[in-house]
Amino acid sequence: MDQTFKVAAIWDTEAKVFSSQSDIPGLVIEAGTFEEFVALVEDLAPEVVAANLPKVKRPFYFDIQSHRIHASAHI
């Protein structure tokens, strides 16, 4: 059965970057835009999976989601 890994892009308001949370051990990504984040996942995640989860066979997939929390302007 094909494996799907979850990768969340969490927006850090202070640092102004998306940071990763993932079920892929060792995957650490930061990027200034969501598009850059996705490109880094596509580039780096297959290598990290191969290195840290050698029993996982291709093909595998990445479910990439973006999360951003906004404060109300009326606080």
PLM region descriptions:
Residues 23, 32-34:
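Surface loops and adjacent helix of pleckstrin homology
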Residues 14, 30-31:
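A generic "functional-site adjacency" signal
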Residues 1-8, 28, 35-75:
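Short, charged, surface-exposed hinge/linker loops at domain edges
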